[in-house]
Amino acid sequence: MDFSLLYDQIAGQDAFEWIGLITGVIYVILATYEKPACWIFGIISSGCIAWKSITDYHLMADAGLQGFYIVIGVIGLRQWIKGQPGGLKKPVIISPWKQHLMVIVGCGLLSWPVSWLLITYTDARYGYVDTLLTLLSVWATILLIRKDLHNWVYWIVIDTVYVFLY
């Protein structure tokens, strides 16, 4: 196996990518332990990724998603600090599979018109896939705020596909 391509890519990362990566990893670790501070690191990571999505990768739906993450990070921080009525910690939940099926089908259908707009009016690349991943990421973020355990399944699939886009 030739690792020179991997080395070249790692060596070619700029400050925004490194800051985005490091704060993103901290975000995931803190979210795993249900620490509200995770949202602060998520906001920083999203700002860096938004910049790169626009300037280098031309993934406009993803750039919009990062803007959404910045806003939702503030909401998530507030929700996780506030907790439940009476100061109780927000519990971890699991949503029914039918709900996930409906959301996945809905995101797939909504991706067609949204991707058409992005392809027609911007220099977006990979319009449908970028849009589908963006919509599913919005849903996964909602699940994370709700502390739904299934958010991790979404993130594993979404991030695996994003690796190929970047």
Language-model regions, residue ranges each:
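Short, hydrophobic transmembrane alpha-helix segments
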Residues: 29-37, 52-59
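Helix-coil boundary and interhelical linker segments in multi-pass alpha-helical membrane proteins
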Residues: 51-62, 117-124
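Hydrophobic alpha-helical transmembrane segments of multi-pass membrane proteins
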Residues: 38-54, 70-72
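Membrane-water interface of transmembrane alpha-helices
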Residues: 67-85
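Polytopic alpha-helical membrane-helix bundles and their juxtamembrane interface segments
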Residues: 1-34, 83-85, 91-166
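Hydrophobic alpha-helical membrane segments of integral membrane proteins
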Residues: 40-44, 61-64, 153-157
